[in-house]
């Protein structure tokens, strides 16, 4: 018998296996690999598979104490990226045994934890993941999901309306609560803490929670509708975060909020479990996502962060607008939206979806369109996002010349007009402006909003685009 053979071995000899047939239980990953000059794509692909699973830079004698064939990641297919020089799409299959059940943290630590600093690669991007149903079933997922949220709020047949309170920092708790009340009274369903509103010297969290709860109950009594404010429970420690969520539940409010990337997946999953057990909806903000997902050749796509969130748990998540000030190409954004809401999503490379994904009845997440949008965008948003969405107008509500409540009225009237027109069979894409103009005739608040924002557009090309 041959003894242990020390030394450095090419990765592709062990980890590049084009003949491998993937299993239903494998986690599949699609990477965009940019090898260093002189490194063949097969070696680069195999290096990714090795470094994100069982491999290290040299053979080690302890390899003989386990079954590498059972546990190793395998690069099973490589193809050039269309229209790009020296970039390859590498597909890697990971056996399910490599991952702790119910832990997004462990899944990411394995798949993207170490390999992105690897010297043989100039750049690396995780484009998509196929999560096997066997693994999905180890997660709770979103605390409630779309249908349960509608039933809790008693709101059907239209998108929900939100507003981020601005200025995001600097208001006292009482003035903040006042702004919340005006927006909710005017016809919005939700108002929102901004992502960096936590507990600062000018407004401690407990004071904010109390004044916002007062605003919610007062506006509910006046309008006869259920209202909510996304109370941001994000904090410096998990214990403090949970303390804030518990206080929100004691106040009887319907929804709390978390910054899931800066807060971390472990904290987020704990909060999602608490929210399901205690009947709280959970709004998720994606602060920090563009650090990870905006560059086209390095990092990971928002598609992957989105799937991770559905596993970890959240009832809403920001999803780009297609028409506002923040990044989001239409096809890519719609691909994201389907992965959040639908139970089964077919592979469709034209929308950036590399794998067919079956969510096996894991609850859906409502996409939130937010960032630089106003009443003139309403027809496009209604058409693009459909009913199961939250349309969030911060400046588009608070920037109204007559104040917050009229700003809220303008948005609600514009939304109701668009939903009515759609239900009557009109074409929102073609007739959008006409629909809004007609509605202005019986809403002076909407007419004033249309006057202020008639010419505003944010016209820049998206950075993260699809490969044609």
Swiss-Prot record:
Keyword rRNA-binding applies: no
Catalytic activity, reaction form: 2 (2R)-3-phosphoglycerate + 2 H(+) = D-ribulose 1,5-bisphosphate + CO2 + H2O; D-ribulose 1,5-bisphosphate + O2 = 2-phosphoglycolate + (2R)-3-phosphoglycerate + 2 H(+)
One GO molecular-function entry: monooxygenase activity
Residues bearing the modification N6-carboxylysine: 192
Active site, UniProt feature: 166, 285
InterPro entries: RuBisCO, RuBisCo_large_chain_AS, RuBisCO_lsu_C, RuBisCO_lsu_C_sf, RuBisCO_lsu_fd_N, RuBisCO_lsu_N_sf, RuBisCO_lsuI
N6,N6,N6-trimethyllysine modified-residue sites: 5
HAMAP family reported for this sequence: RuBisCO_L_type1
Cited function: RuBisCO catalyzes two reactions: the carboxylation of D-ribulose 1,5-bisphosphate, the primary event in carbon dioxide fixation, as well as the oxidative fragmentation of the pentose substrate in the photorespiration process. Both reactions occur simultaneously and in competition at the same active site.
Record protein name field: Ribulose bisphosphate carboxylase large chain
Organism expressing this protein natively: Salvia divinorum
Encoding gene (name): rbcL
